[in-house]
From Swiss-Prot:
Organism in which the protein naturally occurs: Rattus norvegicus (Rat)
The UniProt record lists the keyword RNA-binding: no
Glycosylation, residue list: 170
Lineage: superkingdom: Eukaryota
Note: Several bitter taste receptors are expressed in a single taste receptor cell.
Pfam families for this protein: TAS2R
Protein name: Taste receptor type 2 member 109
Parts of the chain that traverse the membrane: 15-35, 63-83, 95-115, 136-156, 192-212, 241-261, 271-291
Length: 320
């Protein structure tokens, strides 16, 4: 039994980095494709709509996030001593926090945009926000920047305090380890609180979208039987995007909460790799949900797949 468990452990230790590497590459390709299509459309039309601006900025932030994670993985595998250096950890943490914060908040801006553009309510407050959707998105983005600054400031202050107190301690190794773990848990708790804000903002929009779809569907049933109008289709597409965002976001937050509650697991390399795979799943796979939910991106992806399918036949024809 012990031999079997050791074999499973050895296999997992070799397989998990490969899974993470493939996941990050898939995410970089998906987000890169999304940014490229929108940039080409911008060059062609000389203008870019608000939703395309959000999608392009979101894709760019996620490309940066995934590249930071990929470089961190490569450095850890190739030079573990460099990866464990305090300065390297601090720089990598700050870069990850910035890119991850922007990725989550831009996805939240996209959720709010879909809600204001697609939902139908007669409330004067909703109509006021709907007619000023660009200002609403701008305000949300500015609030996210303030929270990012606050997050970075508080986390770096907390780290500096922990380091200063750590150097004053002159007692047993076990106490130092527990003290250091407590400091890192405090930093993690602060990070979870800051990252919970966009989730709290996105969840009501999801519920209101469902309610808007339900009321719209009831009205349509009274007039048209067995048909789905454009508004209903738009509601379903928006809901698919928001559901995917919230589902992946929940998994992301739950993995961070698991780290907080069971911090002793952070000593285990396999658990750290598993957490990185969970973190990478959010920016990697959500991009493909966005591609499938956008007609222009979906058509562009189908064109690329068709070209890749026909390319070998074209090369064979040239060889003949």
């Amino acid at each position: 039994m012990e031999h079997f468990l050791k074999s499973i452990f050895d296999i997992s230790k070799n397989v998990l980095p490969i899974i993470l590497f493939i996941e990050l590459i898939i995410g970089i390709i998906g987000n890169g494709f999304m940014a490229l299509v929108h940039c080409m459309d911008w060059v062609k039309r000389k203008k870019m709509s608000l939703v395309n601006q959000i999608l392009t900025t979101l894709a760019t932030s996620r490309i940066c996030l995934l590249w930071f994670m990929l470089l961190g993985l490569l450095i850890t595998l190739l030079d573990p001593d460099l990866a464990s250096a305090r300065m390297m950890i601090q720089v990598a943490s700050n870069l990850w926090i910035i890119a991850n914060h922007m990725s989550i908040w831009l996805a939240t801006c996209l959720t709010v945009f879909y809600f204001l553009k697609i939902a139908n309510f007669s409330s004067s407050l909703f109509l006021y926000l709907k007619w000023r959707v660009e200002k609403v998105i701008s305000v949300i983005f500015l609030v996210s920047l303030v929270l990012l600054f606050l997050n970075m400031l508080l986390m770096n202050l907390e780290n500096d305090m922990c380091i200063a107190e750590y150097h004053q301690i002159n007692i047993s190794y076990s106490f130092i380890y527990h003290y250091r773990a407590d400091c890192e848990r405090r930093v993690l708790r602060l990070h979870i609180i800051i990252l919970s804000v966009p989730f709290v903002l996105s969840l009501p929009t999801f519920l209101l979208l469902i309610f808007s779809l339900w009321t719209h569907h009831k009205k349509m049933q009274q007039h048209v039987q067995g048909r789905r109008d454009a508004s209903t289709t738009a509601h379903f597409k928006a809901l698919q995007t928001v559901i995917a965002f919230l589902l992946l976001y929940c998994i992301f937050i739950l993995s961070m909460l698991l780290q907080f509650w069971k911090y002793e697991l952070m000593k285990k390399p396999l658990f750290i790799l598993f957490c990185h795979i969970v973190y990478g799943a959010f920016p990697s796979f959500h991009s493909y949900v966005l591609i499938l939910g956008d007609m222009k991106l979906r058509q562009a992806s189908l064109s690329v797949l068709l070209w890749l399918k026909c390319r070998p036949n074209y090369i064979e024809t040239l060889d003949l």
